[in-house]
Amino acid sequence: MQDAVTEPKEGMYPFFDRSEDVKYLPTFLFDKEAIIYPGEGTEFMPRYIKGKFALHQRCYAIFDFKDTVTAQFLYFYLKTQNFYFVRNAVGSTVPSLRLDTFQKLKVIIPPKIMQHKVSLCLSSMEQKCNAEKAILQLLLKQKQYLLRQMFI
C-alpha cells in the first residue's frame, strides 16, 4: 500500500484508518455511500462518506443500505452508540470491534419520512459545527502569528 498523505490533493481519495484524521491516497477501493468505523481504539465514532474512498484493513464499512433505513439516519443514530461499542469491544491491549458487535446492535428505525427530517436537521447542524471549528482553527493560527510578532 502507498503512503497516505494528510492533505488532500487533486486526484487523491479519502483513506480511513484507525485515527481521527482522514488521510488521502491516489487510489480508491470503494465508490459507495458508507459509514466507516475504526476497528480498534478507545472511541468508536462513525464517519459518513458518499463517493470514492479507501479503507484500512482494521476498519469496517457499512454500505448497501436496505430500503428501510437511510445511510445518513443510520450514521447519526450510530453516533449515539459509542458507549455500546466501547462496552462490547474485546482485547486487553487495544480494544477491538468484531463483526458480531455490529450484528447484535439493536437499531430503532422510524418511518423513512422521519429519517429524512432527522437527517436533514442533524446534517445542517453538523455542517455548521464543522464550519465553526474551521474558523476557530484559523483564528488560533492568527493568534499564534500575532503572538510571535509581538515577541520578536
Put a short name on every predicted segment.
Residues K106-I152:
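Amphipathic alpha-helical coiled-coil/heptad-repeat segments
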Residues M1-I109:
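DNA target-recognition domains and sequence-specific DNA-contacting regions of bacterial/archaeal
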